[in-house]
Amino acid sequence: MKKSYRVKREKDFQAIFDGGKSTANRKFVIHFLEKEQDHYRVGISVGKRIGNAVTRNAVKRKIRHVIMEFSDHLKRDDFVVIARKGVENLDYQEVKQNLQHVLKLANLLEEGFESEKKH
């Protein structure tokens, strides 16, 4: 994921938290701020309650991969994905399903988007 697609600075995170809206499911919270820009920007937060650094980084990699997979269908807003306790035990498909669910709740995925389901 290119740097221009990331929310990195504290003031950007704070603007999203203060001026935006949020929605959640059991595994993720998404804070988002509607903004007119060329592309979406995403910040990922995985707290120390999730596990050690290796575990947290593995969770972040899964989230990043799912976001990149959905990238063509995401609205051009800023958003922050916060992982909740229990996400460290999910496999990639479960992370994908949960993220897709919460992105739809936040109305950040384009209308009519359905990812292919692998069984």
UniProtKB/Swiss-Prot annotation:
<dbReference type="InterPro" id="IPR000100">
    <property type="entry name" value="RNase_P"/>
</dbReference>
<dbReference type="GO" id="GO:0000049">
    <property type="term" value="F:tRNA binding"/>
</dbReference>
<protein>
    <recommendedName>
        <fullName>Ribonuclease P protein component</fullName>
        <ecNumber>3.1.26.5</ecNumber>
    </recommendedName>
</protein>
<dbReference type="GO" id="GO:0030677">
    <property type="term" value="C:ribonuclease P complex"/>
</dbReference>
<dbReference type="InterPro" id="IPR020539">
    <property type="entry name" value="RNase_P_CS"/>
</dbReference>
<dbReference type="Pfam" id="PF00825">
    <property type="entry name" value="Ribonuclease_P"/>
</dbReference>
<comment type="subunit">
    <text>Consists of a catalytic RNA component (M1 or rnpB) and a protein subunit.</text>
</comment>
<keyword id="KW-0694">RNA-binding</keyword>
<dbReference type="GO" id="GO:0001682">
    <property type="term" value="P:tRNA 5'-leader removal"/>
</dbReference>
<keyword id="KW-0255">Endonuclease</keyword>
<keyword id="KW-0540">Nuclease</keyword>
<dbReference type="GO" id="GO:0042781">
    <property type="term" value="F:3'-tRNA processing endoribonuclease activity"/>
</dbReference>
<dbReference type="InterPro" id="IPR014721">
    <property type="entry name" value="Ribsml_uS5_D2-typ_fold_subgr"/>
</dbReference>
<dbReference type="GO" id="GO:0004526">
    <property type="term" value="F:ribonuclease P activity"/>
</dbReference>
<comment type="similarity">
    <text>Belongs to the RnpA family.</text>
</comment>
<comment type="function">
    <text>RNaseP catalyzes the removal of the 5'-leader sequence from pre-tRNA to produce the mature 5'-terminus. It can also cleave other RNA substrates such as 4.5S RNA. The protein component plays an auxiliary but essential role in vivo by binding to the 5'-leader sequence and broadening the substrate specificity of the ribozyme.</text>
</comment>
<keyword id="KW-0819">tRNA processing</keyword>
<dbReference type="InterPro" id="IPR020568">
    <property type="entry name" value="Ribosomal_Su5_D2-typ_SF"/>
</dbReference>
<keyword id="KW-0378">Hydrolase</keyword>
